[in-house]
Design a protein with these regions (language model features):
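...captures the hydrophobic TM-helix bundle architecture rather than a specific catalytic motif
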Residues: 1-417
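Single conserved hydrophobic/aromatic residue that forms the stacking wall/gate
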Residues: 415-425
C-alpha cells in the first residue's frame, strides 16, 4: 500500500506544484494563466487541480486499506484472503485514479464523448475497490474474530464505506449528475468515503500501534464507546444529506429558506455532528485516562499480531531490531510463532546511531513563515525566512555528526527474554 501510494505521489504532486506556481505568478506578477482576460482560462486551473485532486483521494485511502489489511487478519486469526488480488487491485486503482478527474466537469460543457469516457472510468474504479471489500469479508469468514477497538473500527468501516462507494458510482453516471452536481448528495458521498475509509483507519491504527509506540494500551471500553459514537454520528450526520441533496439542497450556502423544507434534515445532521464530536472527545479523554492509569507492564505482542514490529519490545527501542530478523515467509513473525522458532539468529553487533537534531523542524518553521509572507506580500519577512531556511539546509549539510554507538552488551541487556518468547496461537 505504501509503495503504490508513493508511486501515485510521484506522478500527481508535480501537477499541483506547477499549478500553484502558475497561480503564484498570476497573483504576484500579473500573468494570466487562469484569468480570462488576455487569453487565460479558469478551467485550466480546475483541470490541473483535479488531475492532482482525484489521485490525492487514493493517496489518502490506499494507506488506510493497508491498515485494514493488517488489522483484520490479526483479529480474525486468519491469513489475508487473496493477497495477490489485493495487490493487483491497488495497482489498478492507482492507474485508474489518473483517468477520472473530469467527472467533476460533467455539467460544464465538455461534451458527450468526454462525459462518456470519464463516466466509464469512474465506475470502473469501483471494481478493484469492491474486490478489496470482498477479500476482507472472506478473511473474516470462519475466522476466530476478537472484537477489540481496532477490529471494531475495521468492521464498521465495511458497511459505511460501501454506502459511500455505491453513491460514488451513482455520481459517476454523467446523465444523472445534472441532478446531483453541487448538492448535499455530493457532500454526503465524500464524507461517507473519507470518514469510514480514512478516519476510521487512522483511529484503528492509532489504537493498534499505540502500545508499540508508548508501552501501554488505550482503554478498551472507552475505545469501543468512541468507535460506536463516531459510527452512529457519521450515519446520523450524513445520511440526511443524501435525501436533502436528491431533493435539491445546494451545498456551499450558509442558510436556507424555511420554505425549502430542508430544516428537519439539517437539524438531524446537526445532531449527528454533535454525536461525532462527543466520540472524538471520548478519544481525547481515553488518551488522558490511559496515559495516567494504564499498566506499563505489557508484553511486546499484546494483540497476538502478525508483522515484524511486534517481535521487538514495547515501546520500540531507538535502534528497532537488536538483530536483523530472518524473513522467509510473507508473515514471518506469525509463522515463527506457529512453528516455535525464533526470528533472530546470530550474535549482537554494534549499531551506529545518529544524534538528535532540531534542524528539520526549524527549517520547516522558516518555510511556513516564508509561505505566509509570500501570500500576504510581506517581502522583508519572506526574504528573511527564505535565508533562514537555506541557512538551515547549508548548516545541516556541513554539520559534522559522528553520532554514537550502541554496544552489543547494551543491546543484549535491553532485549529481555520476552523478545524471544512468542504468544501461542
Amino acid at each position: 500500500a505504501s509503495l503504490i501510494t508513493n508511486i501515485i505521489i510521484v506522478f500527481a504532486f508535480p501537477v499541483l506544484t506547477v499549478a500553484l506556481a502558475m497561480g503564484t505568478f498570476d497573483r504576484l506578477f500579473g500573468t494570466h494563466f487562469f484569468a480570462t482576460t488576455n487569453g487565460g482560462m479558469d478551467m485550466l486551473w480546475a483541470n490541473l487541480f483535479w488531475i492532482w485532486g482525484h489521485p490525492e483521494v487514493y493517496i489518502l485511502i490506499l494507506p488506510a486499506f493497508g491498515i485494514y489489511s493488517e488489522i483484520i487478519p490479526t483479529f480474525a486469526g486468519r491469513n489475508l484472503y487473496g493477497y495477490k488480488t489485493m495487490v493487483l487491485s491497488m495497482v489498478l486503482i492507482s492507474l485508474l485514479s489518473f483517468f477520472v478527474w473530469a467527472h467533476h466537469f460533467y455539467t460544464m460543457g465538455q461534451g458527450a464523448l468526454a462525459n462518456s469516457i470519464f463516466s466509464i472510468t469512474t465506475m470502473a474504479i469501483a471494481v478493484p475497490t469492491g474486490i478489496k471489500i470482498f477479500n476482507w469479508l472472506f478473511t473474516l469468514w470462519k475466522g476466530k474474530i476478537r472484537i477489540t477497538t481496532p477490529m471494531l473500527y475495521s468492521i464498521l468501516f465495511i458497511p459505511l464505506f460501501t454506502i459511500g462507494g455505491v453513491t460514488g458510482v451513482m455520481l459517476g453516471m454523467s446523465a444523472a449528475d445534472y441532478q446531483y452536481h453541487n448538492t448535499m448528495f455530493l457532500v454526503a458521498h465524500f464524507h461517507m468515503v473519507i470518514i469510514p475509509g480514512v478516519v476510521f483507519a487512522m483511529l484503528a491504527g492509532l489504537t493498534y500501534w499505540w502500545p508499540k509506540m508508548f508501552g501501554y494500551m488505550l482503554n478498551e471500553r472507552l475505545g469501543k464507546l468512541a468507535a460506536w459514537l463516531i459510527a452512529i454520528g457519521t450515519l446520523v450526520a450524513f445520511m440526511p444529506m443524501f435525501i436533502s441533496g436528491l431533493d435539491g439542497q445546494a451545498r456551499r450556502m450558509y442558510t436556507y429558506s424555511e420554505s425549502t423544507g430542508f430544516g428537519l434534515w439539517n437539524m438531524i445532521a446537526f445532531v449527528g455532528a454533535i454525536i461525532l464530536a462527543i466520540g472524538f472527545i471520548v478519544i481525547v479523554y481515553n488518551i488522558y485516562y490511559s496515559t495516567r492509569y494504564a499498566s506499563r507492564d505489557i508484553p511486546a505482542d499484546p494483540w497476538n499480531a502478525r508483522s515484524l514490529e511486534w517481535a521487538i519490545p514495547s515501546p520500540a527501542p531507538a535502534y528497532n531490531f537488536a538483530k536483523t530478523p530472518v524473513v522467509e515467509t510473507r508473515d514471518a513473525f506469525w509463522t515463527a510463532k506457529k512453528s516455535g522458532k525464533s526470528l533472530f539468529k546470530g550474535d549482537y553487533k554494534e549499531i551506529h546511531m545518529p544524534n538528535y537534531s532540531g534542524q528539520p523542524i526549524i527549517a520547516a518553521g522558516f518555510l511556513f513563515v516564508f509561505g505566509f509572507a509570500m501570500i500576504f506580500s510581506m517581502w522583508v519577512l519572506a526574504i528573511i525566512s527564505a535565508l533562514g531556511f537555506f541557512g538551515c539546509l547549508i548548516y545541516r549539510t556541513f554539520e559534522k555528526d559522528d553520532g554514537y554507538h550502541i554496544s552489543p552488551k547494551e543491546r543484549s541487556e535491553e532485549h529481555t527474554s520476552e523478545l524471544q518468547s512468542h504468544t501461542e496461537i
